[in-house]
Amino acid sequence: MNRKWDRIHTIIKTLGELRFKGRLRPETIRRADAAYDLPAVFKPEAFAGLNWETALPGDTWGGADRHFWFDTQVKLPADWRGEKVLLCLSTGATDLWNTDNPQVIVYRDGQMYGTMDLNHNRILLEERAAGGETVGLSFYAYSNSAGRTNFFDVSLCALDREIDQLYYDLKVLWDLADLMGDEENGRLELEEVLNRCVNLLDLRDVSGPAFAQSVKEAEAFLQTSHYSAERPLPRVVVHGIGHTHIDVAWKWPLRQTRQKAVRSFLTVIRLMEEYPEYRFMSSQPQLYQFVKEEAPWLYEKIRERVREGRWETEGAMWLEADCNLSSGESLIRHIL
């Protein structure tokens, strides 16, 4: 057992928890069954005919191929002025390979805003909150579970930017080192850097000024020792390009694939707004056709990103082939 390595990991996880310096839950959330309809914009009167009930903490919901609306309003605290605010959602799902886990489209003040699921359980709500503003949030939630097995725990979190930066800068190096062999030089070097960095943290009182100052010092050390442009690097350039793999007809009806395409591409657009350097590639023209029909405004956003050179359309086939079943002749006919 490597006690030093385990200690580093524990401290990184602790920083992950300390990133959230404030958390706010809605006073009430209402829930109603929803139709198989995907509005890009909805008006409050559209909710008038629904059979609403209060969604209490700990309530479960779900079912096979079903949709639900969740609706609430949240007033941000006045002292959150200038804070970076995230919308957080937990449904209780834990299986990363469960493609039927709850998937949600978020509407902010009536406008389609973002998407959430097991892998995307936080989205940016405010880069710098005004403080005291009221936000209307509605959630169009899809379930394909056998029964009422899902939860719906919504909260808004104020993010500490400096702790968040240090957390990810440490986590990237830890994840990288963890993939290496115990005796590899690269791992030993990273372990030394990580250990020296976490040793700078004053964890005696994480709410005090000494801890806040130590976070700045640890980040400065990490930038100088590892992330600095002056640090000699191997002559290797790696380009990270985003991609989403969507099976058009698999574990859910084809009509749900149309919504899945909208959810996935909306996530990409939001990430591009938050991270201008982000690049994305997707094939399967059929998916673009679905998005064009279901959410034309989103399709136009994609076209803008393509023109900017940030979104690459790829692929020789209209629909991605299942190469386990297809014959060589059918694949060639599809391409031609």
Where are these regions (language model features)?
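Carbohydrate-active enzymes and regulators
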Residues: 1-336
